């Protein structure tokens, strides 16, 4: 006799979240936002990291939301210890200030999966407006691949012609090209993936254009951090600016970034624009413009991230003659955008993150690609 199963009666395993923040208001709001979701629950709140440490031991949560500035031990110190001793998915809750942005970049380096920018004023209304973003980032964090941080983080210091961040010395490509263009798309986990690639590219690399999903106010610090580590120059893209070899241009948060052409030069177009695939900046927007303008002189790179932003346009790039690299699942924090790019037939090579920069250099240095026009 057939037995009918009512799926509504099946209790799904909920994402267990611990909220750590020194503000009672923020703790209460975040707990309320989380508990409204059918697939997650706030199992505990703590007003400082030392209490959180005991709570993590007792409750074994799936995800931690962590404030940056707290008493007794700040969030960055706690995060560093946590990722060395008991790595777990962490979503940072950071203040939208220049200092907050710089510290957030450090948190992502230490292993935080993502961050939410809470407003300096109107916290209650601001967090309520961000509720969809908060729960989405918690869900993504719960599925992310978390890696144990090294006992002593390697200091990455730029040295022309020498090693950067512990890597082998950066090889020269041998010819500065104004025709070629490298374009990179990333989302969750992308800040560190982008750093891994850019710190391994030489000063004579072609121009590089990058879209990393990031809100306004944070890309300036991201670009400045990369610029201090790389042999190439790294900056936020500026509307109308010529795209130069040996330079990387990052889409400003909250703007759409395209590549255009003016005579023999590639030019950055930065504008407000509409959300595309729910994102601004959107990888789809950048890659579609590269397919149209750069064609077979483009090299595409799709890195870790949730969703499908950029997958269709990366296939358009391939159809226009580009050569595309996609990060493999094992090295991704979230294997969403790379998976979609592969499913769309956009990948020429699927590689571990650490292999992408050497493969790019080899491709750019090869005789067949050096004179590809």
UniProtKB/Swiss-Prot annotation:
The keyword Hydrolase applies. Residues 16-133 form the Response regulatory domain. GO terms for biological process: chemotaxis. It comes from the Bacteria. The active site is at 187, 213, 309. Disulfide bonds: none annotated. PROSITE patterns: CHEB, RESPONSE_REGULATORY. GO terms for molecular function: phosphorelay response regulator activity; protein-glutamate methylesterase activity; protein-glutamine glutaminase activity. Keywords: Chemotaxis, Cytoplasm, Hydrolase, Phosphoprotein. Its main location: cytoplasm. Residues 175-367 form the CheB-type methylesterase domain. Involved in chemotaxis. Part of a chemotaxis signal transduction system that modulates chemotaxis in response to various stimuli. Catalyzes the demethylation of specific methylglutamate residues introduced into the chemoreceptors (methyl-accepting chemotaxis proteins or MCP) by CheR. Also mediates the irreversible deamidation of specific glutamine residues to glutamic acid. HAMAP family: CheB_chemtxs (MF_00099). This is Protein-glutamate methylesterase/protein-glutamine glutaminase 1. It comes from Albidiferax ferrireducens (strain ATCC BAA-621 / DSM 15236 / T118). The lineage of its organism: Bacteria, Pseudomonadati, Pseudomonadota, Betaproteobacteria, Burkholderiales. The gene is cheB1.
């Amino acid at each position: 006799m057939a037995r009918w199963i009512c799926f509504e009666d099946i209790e799904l395993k909920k994402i267990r979240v611990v909220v750590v923040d020194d503000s009672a208001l923020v703790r209460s709001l975040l707990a309320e936002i989380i508990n409204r979701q059918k697939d997650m629950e706030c199992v505990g709140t703590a007003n400082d990291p030392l209490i959180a440490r005991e709570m993590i031991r007792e409750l074994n949560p799936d995800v931690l939301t962590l404030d940056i500035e707290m008493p007794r031990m700040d969030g960055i110190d706690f995060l560093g210890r946590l990722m060395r001793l008991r790595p777990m998915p962490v979503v940072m809750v950071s203040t939208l200030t220049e200092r907050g942005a710089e510290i957030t970049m450090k948190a992502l380096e230490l292993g935080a999966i993502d961050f939410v920018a809470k407003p300096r004023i109107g916290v209650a209304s601001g967090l309520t407006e961000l509720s969809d973003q908060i729960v989405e980032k918690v869900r993504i964090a719960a599925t992310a691949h978390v890696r144990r941080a090294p006992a002593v983080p390697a200091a990455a210091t730029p040295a022309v012609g020498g090693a950067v961040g512990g890597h082998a010395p950066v090889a020269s490509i041998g010819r500065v090209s104004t025709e070629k263009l490298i374009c990179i798309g990333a989302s969750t986990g992308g800040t560190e993936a982008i750093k891994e690639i850019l710190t391994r590219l030489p000063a004579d690399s072609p121009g590089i254009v990058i879209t990393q999903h990031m809100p306004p106010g944070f890309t300036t610090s991201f670009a400045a951090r990369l610029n201090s580590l790389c042999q190439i120059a790294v900056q936020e893209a500026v509307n109308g600016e010529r795209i130069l070899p040996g330079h990387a241009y990052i889409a400003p948060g909250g703007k759409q970034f395209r590549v255009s052409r003016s005579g023999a030069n590639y030019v950055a177009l930065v504008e407000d624009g509409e959300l595309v695939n729910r994102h601004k900046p959107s990888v789809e927007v950048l890659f579609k413009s590269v397919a149209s303008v750069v064609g077979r002189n483009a090299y595409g790179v799709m890195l870790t991230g949730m969703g499908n932003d950029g997958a269709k346009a990366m296939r358009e790039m391939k159809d226009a003659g580009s050569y595309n690299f996609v990060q493999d699942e094992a090295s991704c924090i979230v294997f969403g955008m790379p998976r979609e790019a592969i499913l769309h037939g956009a990948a020429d090579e699927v590689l571990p993150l650490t292999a992408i920069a050497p493969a790019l250099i080899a491709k750019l240095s090869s005789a067949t690609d050096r004179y590809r026009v």
